[in-house]
Amino acid sequence: MLKKYAVDQLKEGMVVGQAVYKEDMSVLLGEGTVLNQQMIDSLSERNIVSVEIREEDGEEALAPMPQKSQGVQGAPAKTIPLKEPILDEGYVRDYGDCFIELKSLFEVTKAHGSVDKDSAETLAQNILPLCSGAKAVAHIHNMTPKGEYTIHHSLHVAILAGLMGKWLKMPRKDQLRLITAGALILIGNLRIEQAMLDKEGVLTPDERKIMQEHPKFGHELIMAGGLGEDKEIAEAVLQYHERGDGSGYPRGLVKEEIGKFARILAIMDMYDAMASDRSYAKKRSPFEVFNILSDDIMNGRLDTDFGFRFIRRVCHSLNGNWVKLSNGEAGKIIYIDESRLAALPVVQTMDGEFMDLNLRKDVKVEYLLTSREIEEE
């Protein structure tokens, strides 16, 4: 039998149960290859998320002695991709715990009229372990949130912010502060009627004006408590809807008038909002979102360095995810060209066909499938 393992769970001696492909679509590790540490490190460096491992009687099939890779050059054999979603039970459990913790923080904030500093900082420490590269990106897309968009979106932004902090090599203290700010971007929604937050369709001009007050409301709730001593966190919540060309809100700031944390969170917020189902809009393909973000970067609305860095890292963390294609088929992402910004993926469909969407202009990715949607395919 075969079992999917995240790359960081692989051990020397495990036996590859299904071929792993290189960038040129030749085989990197052939079926039956016995893993050594060098191979495992190579998989991690290539942003490969998971590998199918051969098991016997429910236990890992460890080879008795190391062997050379049986990978071969040339076109890959036509195999059928397995449908198991990339979900780690421990990650899902820890995400659920952080979700409950964040929801409680929102409820206490609403009751007391201020954000509790200790609770917010403890939450950030609990979120930090969830910020684990490709695994974090895969789980954000593969899990199936049930309602509570405000909390899920805030938690997603916090996780993506933690990832960005690591990619920028921020000190751990600053990573935690950025996570805290990300978790609180929608805290101001507590002062907006739930019916308006849940409204389907376009907001009226008056409703839009009220909605655009939520950064101010959030800033006030932070400043009312001890967390207000950290001006950068409070500023980030106030400014994350500002844009470099002055078209944002609530103050119409431009370029360097916008704080560093706010410029980072603007990107995280846009990405997750468009890649998620909302009451008034269906989720989009991350690759479509990358194009929108790229346009905003080129037009000076989003920070150039943070924006391009985020797109490149997240784009190449999507390997191994399943997507719904515009022709109605489902496909598994098996390769994304790391040399190109926001490159389209090569996918393998359920009948084993390989499809390079950089060349197939008649087919595009509609959206990423959740674990539940994968099971229904």
Predicted regions located by residue number:
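Terminal helices and disordered tails flanking the catalytic cores of nucleotide-processing hydrolases
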Residues: 1-109, 283-377
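Short leucine-rich amphipathic alpha-helices used at interfaces
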Residues: 11, 17-18, 139, 145-146, ...
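Short, contiguous strand/loop micro-motifs
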Residues: 25-28, 148, 248
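Acidic/His-rich, divalent-metal-binding segments that scaffold phosphate/diphosphate chemistry
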Residues: 70-212, 223-230
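Short alpha-helical linear motifs
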Residues: 144-147, 198-206, 232, 237, ...
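Alpha-helical scaffolding flanking metal-ion-dependent phosphate/phosphodiester catalytic sites
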Residues: 157, 178-191, 209-220, 224-307, ...
